[in-house]
Amino acid sequence: MEVDGETQIEELECDIRTLRKQLKAKVQQLKTLKKHFQKNCINKLNNNEIARYSRQIILSEIGVQGQLKLKRSSVLVVGAGGLGCPSALYLAGAGIGRIGILDYDEVELTNLHRQLLHTECSVGLTKVESVRSYLEELNSQIEIVTHHIQLTSDNALQTLESYDIVVDATDNVATRYLLNDACVLLKKPLVSGSALQLEGQLTVYNFNGGPCYRCLFPNPPPPETVTNCGDGGVLGAITGVIGALQALETIKIILGNSGVLSGRLLLFDGHQSTFRNLKLRPKKADCAVCSDNPSLTKLIDYEQFCSMKATDKDSHLNLLAPHERITVQEYKSLAESNVPHLLVDVRGANQFEICQLPASINVPIDDILKNRRTAEVTQLAATGGPVFVVCRRGNDSQLAVRHLSQLFQEQGLAPPRDIVGGLHAWTHNIDPEFPIY
């Protein structure tokens, strides 16, 4: 009897696998048929589309002709993260005929508080496939195209040229310049958004005679002054607000509506829940890329131009000489030998509360750079022995060491040293149970 039961289980599992394969094949056939049907029906709305989009079709700003414009349009969303997820979601819901999703990354647990098209089951999957799966379940009437690549000067023009509008939902400076220049060369509007901490910004570049990104920022900022979500943090609802507004601006461009944020910058303050609308400087007459006589007529090496990587991943600064730094292994050996020293943790107080190394004192980086507590640090250093500086990933600690070195030298103190890689390196190389965030 027991053998028969095991046999039945195996047979059922085999049947289920077969049915799943058949279902997958049928689903693919259905998608292919729908795409073929939709391509041949771009001049009218079917009954399903009329019912689905009825609440926006009845708006005088849209109507049937407006919905057909949306159906015939194509939008590329660059970045499937905090901004890209809500933007793609509302574009798909509105009935954009073809939506491209471009991202090189995979879903991580740290994404889920703000990138709400991904789920716990998506962790480890590519972001583009995770978004595609969600959007196809939301709206099977539209086409979702995935680009699992990192955008570069070599592939940008070819990738962007088949879309009407580009949505910049990225989080790094080099890619912003790349997207701007590519959109100018291809004569495509660029809907640009950003979000950090509890604030967000939104504008539209290269549209209706308005400025491009280079008109406003001809030169990139120094790498050490740039903060991304990984360093500065962000509240998920902020990215939701800005991402949804990016979708709105995109829809307005497609419909030909007035009021597009070209030449204007929308600022959102999540602290006070207020919006401000600022007028931007006009198009620059001598802009390197969008002027009548541009000096840039092809894409360049943007990582070299910006002196930073074209990636949303946390960057690693290299500001100090080797003798000004110490590895986590070296620091562990020193601490276990009970050598007198002072360990200064320059993270913010809220981050220090999450986790800290034994005997460390918290002096936030802002208090050091603005000389609010440097006297305190030098006094402790005079009696506590050599100073080692740590932060989350080893960037702010370098800034702190660079700032403190001159003060220490003036007072005859041993120079401070940075712990390479910060607390992330401690978790990876010393204590895997130490919290990482």
UniProtKB/Swiss-Prot annotation:
From which source organism is this entry? Aedes aegypti (Yellowfever mosquito)
* CDD domains, sorted: ThiF_MoeB_HesA_family (cd00757)
Task: Indicate what this protein is called per its UniProt record.
Answer: Adenylyltransferase and sulfurtransferase MOCS3
Q: Where in the cell is it found?
A: Cytoplasm, Cytosol
| Entry keyword Phosphoprotein | no
Q: Which cofactor does it need?
A: Zn(2+)
Tell me a GO cellular component. cytosol
Query: Which Gene Ontology terms cover its molecular function?
Result: ATP binding; metal ion binding; molybdopterin-synthase adenylyltransferase activity; molybdopterin-synthase sulfurtransferase activity; thiosulfate-cyanide sulfurtransferase activity; URM1 activating enzyme activity
According to the record, how does the cofactor bind? Binds 1 zinc ion per subunit.
**Which InterPro entries does the record cross-reference, listed alphabetically?**
MOCS3/Uba4, Rhodanese-like_dom, Rhodanese-like_dom_sf, ThiF/MoeB/HesA, ThiF_NAD_FAD-bd, Ubiquitin-activating_enz
Protein family per UniProt: In the N-terminal section; belongs to the HesA/MoeB/ThiF family. UBA4 subfamily.
